[in-house]
């Protein structure tokens, strides 16, 4: 989507704020003893309060308001009976629509303290990779510069990127052009970023793996070697002044 009017911009900011509020409220509630289904109910209540609709349910008939992935799960984890434990690596991915406009955001974090420092490391490096990618977001620059920055950050920290999970265009649907915002450099991709373009940027940083495979059900993705993976995602509008993150709530 290319934002052309202030009405479109405000609508994107509104759904971005709603998704960010859901994400942050769920993260705050992620404590040892809570189930992923209980966390998902928080999203249901907040979506209803703000007049928004879960995109996974609306677009994909997904069996949950949000995707909650724990430890060996990388993405598209189904909320259910799973109990959160101290030291778990958790990813919460929230996407929704309101009045025909979408936002998509995600965060990975460690619950409490873990005796496995690599869990926190992949989270920290995912954040670093996202921040470095944002330095490349300007009209007229190559889309592939985002992936180059993400991959470089991973390598500098002796980590890898997941190559078959990518960002994407977003705005008037959950997935639209550009179909892929890679987390590595693709020299064949000559796509240029445009003023007002809306994209979801989501680095997936791993301890060892470079690909995910289907997991325990038809939705969840896992790595074959059970590598830890962390994701950070925001909905980003390309502007001449730099990236505008609709899913970031200012402190």
Curated annotation (Swiss-Prot):
Signal peptide: none annotated. InterPro entries: Creatinase/aminopeptidase-like, Pept_M24, Pept_M24_MAP, Pept_M24A_MAP1. Keywords: Aminopeptidase, Hydrolase, Metal-binding, Protease. Its EC number is 3.4.11.18. Binds 2 divalent metal cations per subunit. Has a high-affinity and a low affinity metal-binding site. The true nature of the physiological cofactor is under debate. The enzyme is active with cobalt, zinc, manganese or divalent iron ions. Most likely, methionine aminopeptidases function as mononuclear Fe(2+)-metalloproteases under physiological conditions, and the catalytically relevant metal-binding site has been assigned to the histidine-containing high-affinity site. Its cofactor is Co(2+); Zn(2+); Mn(2+); Fe(2+). It catalyses: Release of N-terminal amino acids, preferentially methionine, from peptides and arylamides. Substrate binds at residues 76, 175. It is an enzyme of class 3 (hydrolase). A divalent metal cation 2 binds at residues 104, 168, 202, 233. One of its GO terms (biological process) is proteolysis. One of its GO terms (molecular function) is metal ion binding. A divalent metal cation 1 binds at residues 93, 104, 233. It comes from the Bacteria. Pfam families: Peptidase_M24. Monomer. Belongs to the peptidase M24A family. Methionine aminopeptidase type 1 subfamily. Removes the N-terminal methionine from nascent proteins. The N-terminal methionine is often cleaved when the second residue in the primary sequence is small and uncharged (Met-Ala-, Cys, Gly, Pro, Ser, Thr, or Val). Requires deformylation of the N(alpha)-formylated initiator methionine before it can be hydrolyzed. This is Methionine aminopeptidase. It comes from Staphylococcus epidermidis (strain ATCC 12228 / FDA PCI 1200). The lineage of its organism: Bacteria, Bacillati, Bacillota, Bacilli, Bacillales. The gene is map.
């Amino acid at each position: 989507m290319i934002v052309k009017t202030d009405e479109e911009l405000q609508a994107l900011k509104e759904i971005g704020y709603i998704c960010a509020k859901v994400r942050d409220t769920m993260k705050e509630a992620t404590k040892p003893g809570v189930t992923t289904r209980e966390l998902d109910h928080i999203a249901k209540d907040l979506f209803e309060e703000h007049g928004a609709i879960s995109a996974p349910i609306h677009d994909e008939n997904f069996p949950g308001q949000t995707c909650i992935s724990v430890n060996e799960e990388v993405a598209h984890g189904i909320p259910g009976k799973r109990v959160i434990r101290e030291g778990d690596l958790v990813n919460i991915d929230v996407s929704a629509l309101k009045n025909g406009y979408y936002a998509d955001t995600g965060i990975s974090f460690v619950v409490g303290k873990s005796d496995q420092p690599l869990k926190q490391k992949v989270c920290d490096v995912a954040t670093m990779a996202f921040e470095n990618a944002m330095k490349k977001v300007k009209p007229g620059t190559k889309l592939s510069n985002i992936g180059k920055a993400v991959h470089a950050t991973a390598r500098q920290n002796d980590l890898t990127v997941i190559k078959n999970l990518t960002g994407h265009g977003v705005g008037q649907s959950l997935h639209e052009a550009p179909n892929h915002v890679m987390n590595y450099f693709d020299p064949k991709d000559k796509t240029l970023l445009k003023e007002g373009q809306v994209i979801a940027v989501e680095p997936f940083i791993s301890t060892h793996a470079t690909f995910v495979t289907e997991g325990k059900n038809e939705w969840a993705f896992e790595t074959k070697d059970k590598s830890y993976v962390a994701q950070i995602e925001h909905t980003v509008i390309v502007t001449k002044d730099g990236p505008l993150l609709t899913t970031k709530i200012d402190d």
